[in-house]
Amino acid sequence: YYVYGQGGLNGIYTDPAKAVLRADTLGGVVLNRTQQYVWERGNKKTKMQIDTEGIPEIVLQGTYDIKTLKKSLKKTGTVIDLSGCSLDSVLYEISAQRPVIAKTGADTSVVIVGYDEYNTWLYDPVKKETYPYGMNDSTDLFQKAGNVFITYIETVNY
């Protein structure tokens, strides 16, 4: 993962979360090896809602087991572990139409499928329902669970 900021290449990382954290301090961007934007500082829409019908079933199950996700999504895209990043940072992924699996407890998770000024929109893998949850409450919920966030970036075929 390539971090660009302050006019040039700043660093190369194997850990996407570390790349995002670095780019955030620089007001920069993170690109992958195929030059796709993985993350951009300050370039997210004010609100976004992703239709759950277009999300792969393995993501909707809310598993945060990286091996299982990689195996199931290998033809679809690359799994990106953003654990340790802030909720505000990972909302860029939603803005880019990428759902984010977020750990909420020891064995529980949700899929973040949207946000607006006041709420995140969370998909519950057990109830199979989407509901709004306050932004501050979401931040607290995810922080208490360790800020474990997993998303994926679709493969581009040139």
Set out the residue ranges of the language-model regions.
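Short aromatic-glycine-(Arg/Gly/Cys) micro-motifs in beta-strand/loop hairpins
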Residues: 1-8, 28-29, 37-46
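Residue-level detector of conserved, well-ordered beta-strand and adjacent loop positions
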Residues: 4, 14, 31, 113, ...
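Short, flexible active-site loop motifs that bind/organize anionic cofactors or intermediates
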Residues: 8-9, 80
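Predominantly a core beta-strand signature of beta-propeller blades
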Residues: 9-10, 130
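A short, charged, amphipathic alpha-helix used as a generic interaction element across diverse proteins
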Residues: 13-31
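A structural signal for the beta-strand cores of small, secreted beta-rich domains
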Residues: 14, 38-40, 110
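Conserved active-site-adjacent core of cysteine acyl-enzyme catalytic domains
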Residues: 44-158
